[in-house]
């Protein structure tokens, strides 16, 4: 909320390199258990249809339309930078030696004119999520809505406080859950 943003993407979004030190600072402010919610914006669009990156690490091929190719190249390079952030965050967390669960998910796909037919899973509004931990949680695959993910993680951690979390944890598998 009060980060000193020094670096932005060519489209004006804050880059993720600012996040690791700020997350570590947040974790250092208390001696006890922490809950930190961080939102990355580096990969957000609109994605430029003109060449924007001087020396991209990843070159997109196979897209005939030059504007679309430029937009995809910009997007995949920003996601590549976001992947680096994830690796840096995990390294920093591992060095702390504290029991930790990290949840990574996207709340939407990129605004690149995608249609359901373009996607392997055919679901335009689904995104993947990854849970990383150093406490031995059992891997559990499945589909879950973004608004349910924290209730699911807290349930797996045996945390059952909070009205909304309790509702999602207790009612998710019932007939009238979202009625």
Please state what every model-predicted region is.
Residues 1-179:
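Solvent-exposed soluble domains appended to multi-pass membrane proteins
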